[in-house]
């Protein structure tokens, strides 16, 4: 009789452990885990076509990871733009980006490192000095592509580096050319996850 009771207790404990483990697995496999975040950083860009155009901005963003793979963010930025010839312009803008977690299937979810692809559209505004009377206020639309590498500092705080490329119509007329403007970009910042 005692053997039967001991066997029954062992089986019940094993079953309870198995059920608990299955609950943990199901919780971790849930593909719909939304997560809000805000971020801030410094963004710089330099023309890739040799036109000596550089830009430095403060950038803030807010977004949502819809699940463990796809997210979106809204960005705003403001800063300064330097053109060849010693001219500069105030710049500000806003954009929308789609984020894709490239590490979801290749790394542990609790990994301290994350790599995401970024694709988006950005609307910009440039306020030029009086030397450019025909284009004192210029609006632009740009496409941007990049990769974001993020490292967890704490459970909620991440540091990220985001290199990328920005493509847009040329927005200034100092040399009469009509080239598309292509710039390499780099953003360094921090993200707070809610």
Regions found by a protein language model. Give the residues of each.
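Detector for outer-membrane/organellar transmembrane beta-barrel domains
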Residues: 93-96, 162-169, 175-193
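Solvent-exposed loop/turn segments connecting transmembrane beta-strands
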Residues: 47-56, 83-89, 174-180
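Bacterial N-terminal signal peptides
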Residues: 9-16
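Gram-negative (and chloroplast) outer-membrane scaffold detector with strong preference
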Residues: 64-142, 151-155, 191-192
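Outer-membrane beta-barrel biogenesis signature
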Residues: 5, 19-39, 102-115, 194
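Bacterial N-terminal signal peptides that target proteins for export
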Residues: 1-7
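Hydrophobic, lipid-facing positions within transmembrane beta-strands of outer-membrane proteins
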Residues: 36-38, 56-60, 92-96, 115, ...
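Short glycine/proline- and aromatic-enriched beta-strand/turn motifs that initiate or cap beta-hairpins
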Residues: 21-65, 71, 126
């Amino acid at each position: 009789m005692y053997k039967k009771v001991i066997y029954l207790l062992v089986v019940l404990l094993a079953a309870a452990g198995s059920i608990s483990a299955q609950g943990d697995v199901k919780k971790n496999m849930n593909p719909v885990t939304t997560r809000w975040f805000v971020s801030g950083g410094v963004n710089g860009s330099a023309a890739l076509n040799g036109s000596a155009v550089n830009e430095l901005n403060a950038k803030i963003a807010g977004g949502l990871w819809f699940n463990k793979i796809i997210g979106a963010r809204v960005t705003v930025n403001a800063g300064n733009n330097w053109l060849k010839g010693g001219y500069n312009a105030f710049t500000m803008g806003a954009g929308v980006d789609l984020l894709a977690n490239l590490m979801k299937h290749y790394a542990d979810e609790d990994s301290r490192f994350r790599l995401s692809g970024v694709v988006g559209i950005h609307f910009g505004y440039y306020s030029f000095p009086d030397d450019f009377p025909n284009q004192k206020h210029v609006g632009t639309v740009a496409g941007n592509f990049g990769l974001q590498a993020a490292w967890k500092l704490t459970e909620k705080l991440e540091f990220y580096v985001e290199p990328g490329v920005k493509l847009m119509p040329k927005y200034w007329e100092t040399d009469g050319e009509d080239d598309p403007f292509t710039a390499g970009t780099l953003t360094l910042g921090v993200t707070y996850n809610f």
